[in-house]
Each structure stands twice: as C-alpha cells, then as structure tokens.
Amino acid sequence: MKFWKIFILIFTLKTNIVLGALKTVDKIVALVNHNIILDSDIRHNIYMIQDNILNGNDNILQDISHYQKILDQLIIDNLIFQISDQQKINIDHTQLNQMINCILNLYDMTFDKFRAYLYDIGLNYEKFYFQQYQHMLKKQICDHVMHDRAHILTNEINKIVKKSNIIDINKQFKLRHITFSLPIQPTPSQIDRIEYFARLLIKKKEFNNNIKELIRTYSNKNIIQIIKVHETEWVSWKDIPIIFDKYLQTINKGDVIGPIISCDGIHIVEIQDIRYKQIMLPVTKVTAKIFGIQNSCENISIVEQLLQIKENMEKSNTAFNMMIKEKSKDICFNHYEENTICKDLDDFEPSIRKALSSLKSNEISIPVHTSCGWRLIQLIDISILEYNEIMYERAYLYLLNNKFDEIMKNWIQELRSESYIKIIN
C-alpha cells in the first residue's frame, strides 16, 4: 500500500511538471496598446538573425540583453503598424511581387524551389511574404515621417555644398549596387553582422567575379531577406548619392566601393564601366511611371488593350495594377511590369523621350513602342536644374540621410510616451 501511495505521489508530481511546462510553452511578454507580444515572437526573431541557433548555440536564447533588444524592436514595430492601421496605409502588392522576383533571380530559384527552401529553414511562404510586406510598410511610413519632420536650413545646405568636391557631371558609370537593408534603429550587433558579411563578399570577389554566386554560396537563412542587387544602366555622377563622392574621384573600372552605412542600409558598389558623355546645362529631370507587358513587341492586340486601360484609368482614376487584376485572365498580362523612374530626360530612349516631352503632369501617353515592347507612360514630375541646383539637391539628400537616426529616435520616443506599454516579466 505504501508503494502505491509513493507511486501515485510521484506520478502526480511528474504530471504537474509536464502540464506546467506545456502551459509555459508560450506566454505574453508585453502589451502595446491593444496588441500583445509573445515570447515565441521574440524567439522566432532571434532564430532568424543568428546562425545555426539549433546546433547547440542555446546560450543566445538565455542572453537577457539580446532578448531585450529584440523585444524593443518588436515594440517599435507594433507602434508603427498601429499607425498604418489607423491611417489605412497599405503597400501595393505589385512592388512586393517584384521584390520577390528579384530574390528568385538572385538565388537562381524557381518559385517552387524557393517555397521548399523557406520550409527547410522553418518558414512558410505566407509568413515570409507577410514579413516582407511589413518591412516595406515600415519603410514607407518612416519615409513619410522623415519628409514631414526634416527641417533642413539653407545655411546647412550651403556648408555641405562648400565642403563637397566639384563633380564631373559628364562622367557616367555602370554600377552593380548591392544593398543590405537594416531594421529601424538597428542594434550594433545587427550592423556588425551584416557589415562582416559585406566585407566577406568583397574579399571573396578577388577569387570569384560572380557576385550572385558568392551571395548564394556564403549567405544563410537571414541574408535571403535583406539583400538587393541592382545593375544600373549608365548613371550620371550627379545622380549618385554624395556619400560615394570621395571614392568616385579616382575610381577605376572593376573597383569596389564599400561597405558604406547609410539610413537605408549597408551598401557595396561595383564599378562595371565608366564613360564620358557631354551633358548640356540646364538638365531636365523627369519622374515617370512606365507600364507595359514583357516581350510584347509582336503582339498587336496588346496595343488595343493598353489603349483601353489608358481610357479606363483616365475615367476612373484607377491605378495600373488594379486595371491589370481585371485582365488577369488574359495570358499576356501575366508578365506586366510597372516602374517609377527618375532620371534625365536625355537618358530615356528616343521613343519614351518623345512621349514624355508631349505630356502634362499626371497625363498618360498612348501606347509607345520601345526596345522592351509596348508601354504606357505617365509623367509624374518634371524640373529644370542648373549646376548649383543639382549640388543643392544632392546636399539636401545627404543631410536628410544624416538626420534619419535622430528624427526616428525622437519620433519613436513620442510614440512610446503616447502609448500604453507594459513589459510582463
């Protein structure tokens, strides 16, 4: 009888321990207004920013300071997303799909292979898609805050213009521009980790010139979400951010600049080619939205459909991508492109340049035949710039970049002070 009493006591204790463990698998660690943050949210983020965390590196999970930093970032994210809900700010899914297509191209994956890869690292595609949506949403909100709150004085701009080097506006570059995006208010360890990877790529490039292959070889589960590789056409020195000026003075073809840290991430720039092209001042700067169907040169019916889209847009003031959703059953419209481009009028190909010259602000062209197929073109903005205005514009953007951290810090402090935030131990 005594044996059974002891057995029942032990069984009860074991059961309570197991049930207690089950109850504490997840828990609420913070309240942010009407939202909650779970312990599992923090652990998932730690997993996504550490290497081989499941291979015996469990002490990271116990690092209180690291845990606290991730919690702080999630609190900031919650505050920002609550603003997007209140103001009904959304992201165009066309941009997001284009970004994911760039990732597929970078890693040389089909869509199915990409889904399988995400599954192997503990993510499903829907969760990944939502994470990228949130990232783009945060960036858009922060950009709005920057432009609303940035107060840059004329004397500040004058100081930068006086200090800056004289640029050769006739010098143009073909660039491979690699951007490693950073979270809002990144921790020093996040910056160090990405900067280390950027330096590794530059070092390995001495032995392998294929940068995309190097990224695929040396990146891991975290990097896939934060690298963008953009290969430019000819771009004038005046259109390259001022943070690169000191390097562009003496740069040669094949040289690599970076890593350089700015408000929108860490940058590496590879100089693929250099040329000189006479630019006549003043410069006509154009911002335009160009929309069309890939490989549509031979398909005459697309011209009629693009004309119909133009007419519908002008009548209903509907965006390009919304019109395309209505035509998604047509196989031709499975591969549409939409890009907002800002560059000199002279840098557009002749057919686009001719169309832009005839448009008024926000007016949409008739279908234009280009080297890439048929396109609709919408003029967003046009401005005439002399050399001094070009230098002032570059200085303004440079100061905007420098003030980013301070403006974001003050704004987030205001959000915190106006919100109910409770940390639950």
Swiss-Prot record:
One GO CC term, this protein: outer membrane-bounded periplasmic space
Main subcellular location of this protein, as a coarse class: periplasm
GO molecular function: peptide binding; peptidyl-prolyl cis-trans isomerase activity; unfolded protein binding
Catalytic activity: [protein]-peptidylproline (omega=180) = [protein]-peptidylproline (omega=0)
EC number per UniProt: 5.2.1.8
Location in the cell: Periplasm
Stretch forming the signal peptide: 1-20
Keywords: Chaperone, Isomerase, Periplasm, Repeat, Rotamase, Signal
Start and end residues of each PpiC domain: 170-273, 271-381
GO terms under biological process: Gram-negative-bacterium-type cell outer membrane assembly; protein folding; protein stabilization
Record remark: domains: The PPIase activity resides only in the second parvulin domain. The N-terminal region and the C-terminal tail are necessary and sufficient for the chaperone activity of SurA. The PPIase activity is dispensable for SurA to function as a chaperone. The N-terminal region and the C-terminal tail are also required for porin recognition.
Function text: Chaperone involved in the correct folding and assembly of outer membrane proteins. Recognizes specific patterns of aromatic residues and the orientation of their side chains, which are found more frequently in integral outer membrane proteins. May act in both early periplasmic and late outer membrane-associated steps of protein maturation.
Protein known as: Chaperone SurA
Gene responsible for this protein: surA
